[in-house]
Amino acid sequence: MLDFEKPLFEIRNKIESLKESQDKNDVDLQEEIDMLEASLERETKKIYTNLKPWDRVQIARLQERPTTLDYIPYIFDSFMELHGDRNFRDDPAMIGGIGFLNGRAVTVIGQQRGKDTKDNIYRNFGMAHPEGYRKALRLMKQAEKFNRPIFTFIDTKGAYPGKAAEERGQSESIATNLIEMASLKVPVIAIVIGEGGSGGALGIGIANKVLMLENSTYSVISPEGAAALLWKDSNLAKIAAETMKITAHDIKQLGIIDDVISEPLGGAHKDIEQQALAIKSAFVAQLDSLESLSRDEIANDRFEKFRNIGSYIE
């Protein structure tokens, strides 16, 4: 339960208590239950239509929030995962492969968090090593060779900052991806589905179209990290989250992303299938918008998009 959901938790408890009493004592409490359920619906809408940035940060970090592998079966047909960077090893924190979107062959790449403690250890909490980014680039170059559009799912706190990752060239692997992705001659469409953290997110995020789920975040540093650096107090993370403008609607207003995809009431985890279908619809629309461009124009469109981010007129 998240902090801002406490009122909902209390109403749900009352509903469960009444249902239990109704069954146990054979009394009719349906009218009271109906009233509480109506109250729960009203309160849920009220809370989720007035979320603060820190509330959205908490939703983006939920363990039960859908991951890349949760979405893929609903969006792509006949997905086949491909493994390894052909240099060191396969990184489970970065998955990728080939599938079909409405009958068209595409390449799919995404960061992958774990679903429980054991899985998170295996997936390194979605924080990829250099070999993860090199695997992603290998699949992107393969997609370019065979003229397959690329779809990437961003869902990471950041690239793994451990000693072994640094020794194997973490910064170099991300930098190389930025350079190579900027010039790919096939459409690239990216979506932030949870946390989009720093260079770890950008390593698969240089796309013609960048989308975000409405309760996802995209930032150069976590709110806790920013608060610790700026004010020497990580407890001020809530203030940092508001100041940093890291939520989807703020980032759309800044011109950094192209579109925000709505989530079911309560978050994407409340209805994965509905959320996946919304993502699929957005993917198809964005891909259609790029169909008229030549291969060179696609690469130039992407380059200019990122070249113009942050520009302003005095």
UniProtKB/Swiss-Prot annotation:
Gene3D superfamilies: 2-enoyl-CoA Hydratase, Chain A, domain 1 (3.90.226.10). It catalyses: N(6)-carboxybiotinyl-L-lysyl-[protein] + acetyl-CoA = N(6)-biotinyl-L-lysyl-[protein] + malonyl-CoA. One of its GO terms (cellular component) is acetyl-CoA carboxylase complex. Residues 32-289 form the CoA carboxyltransferase C-terminal domain. It is found in: Cytoplasm. GO terms for molecular function: acetyl-CoA carboxylase activity; ATP binding; carboxyl- or carbamoyltransferase activity. Its EC number is 2.1.3.15. The keyword Lipid biosynthesis applies. SUPFAM superfamilies: ClpP/crotonase (SSF52096). It comes from the Bacteria. Keywords: ATP-binding, Cytoplasm, Fatty acid biosynthesis, Fatty acid metabolism, Lipid biosynthesis, Lipid metabolism, Nucleotide-binding, Transferase. Belongs to the AccA family. This is Acetyl-coenzyme A carboxylase carboxyl transferase subunit alpha. It comes from Staphylococcus aureus (strain USA300). The gene is accA.
